[in-house]
């Protein structure tokens, strides 16, 4: 198996849909480009994904990988548990409010050097 580093953030108070909007912009990019893209996005989800990406970079550095040669091989957000709350409505009814959580996974790998 190739040399990879990963970071996982569980129970992020962020819906998976909003996390995926940011994640889709950086999938497959090298880490310098991904950090530049994330720093320009004015969303809470961008700050959270940026923090997980920096953690994955630190893990790669600890494993002795070349930081300048890393790219995001896999990144995805899955749905975590949901807190269900109820709010009263007219005529004795109530509606459910779902407070969503997500798990964010980031995998980094080194680019393969092509021999000519």
UniProtKB/Swiss-Prot annotation:
InterPro entries in UniProt: Ribosomal_uL22, Ribosomal_uL22_bac/chlpt-type, Ribosomal_uL22_bac/org-type, Ribosomal_uL22_sf
Keywords from the named record: Ribonucleoprotein, Ribosomal protein, RNA-binding, rRNA-binding
Coiled-coil features, chain-numbered ranges: none
Any one GO biological process: translation
Ribosomal protein as UniProt keyword: yes
Pfam families listed in its UniProt record: Ribosomal_L22 (PF00237)
CC annotations in GO: cytosolic large ribosomal subunit
GO molecular-function terms, A-Z: rRNA binding; structural constituent of ribosome
Described function: This protein binds specifically to 23S rRNA; its binding is stimulated by other ribosomal proteins, e.g. L4, L17, and L20. It is important during the early stages of 50S assembly. It makes multiple contacts with different domains of the 23S rRNA in the assembled 50S subunit and ribosome. The globular domain of the protein is located near the polypeptide exit tunnel on the outside of the subunit, while an extended beta-hairpin is found that lines the wall of the exit tunnel in the center of the 70S ribosome.
Subunit relationships: Part of the 50S ribosomal subunit.
HAMAP family reported for this sequence: Ribosomal_uL22_B (MF_01331_B)
Entries under PANTHER family matching the protein: CHLOROPLAST 50S RIBOSOMAL PROTEIN L22-RELATED, LARGE RIBOSOMAL SUBUNIT PROTEIN UL22M
Family: Belongs to the universal ribosomal protein uL22 family.
Stated name of the protein: Large ribosomal subunit protein uL22
Taxonomic source organism: Sulfurihydrogenibium sp. (strain YO3AOP1)
């Amino acid at each position: 198996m190739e040399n990879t580093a990963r970071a996982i953030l569980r129970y992020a108070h962020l819906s998976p849909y909003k996390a995926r909007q940011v994640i889709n912009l950086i999938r497959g990019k090298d880490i310098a480009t991904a950090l530049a893209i994330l720093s320009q996005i004015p969303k809470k989800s961008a700050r959270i994904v940026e923090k997980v990406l920096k953690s994955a970079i630190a893990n790669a550095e600890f494993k002795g990988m070349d930081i300048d040669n890393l790219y995001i091989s896999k990144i995805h957000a899955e749905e975590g548990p949901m807190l269900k709350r109820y709010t009263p409505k007219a005529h004795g009814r109530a509606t459910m409010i779902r407070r969503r959580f997500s798990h964010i996974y980031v995998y980094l790998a080194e680019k393969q050097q092509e021999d000519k």
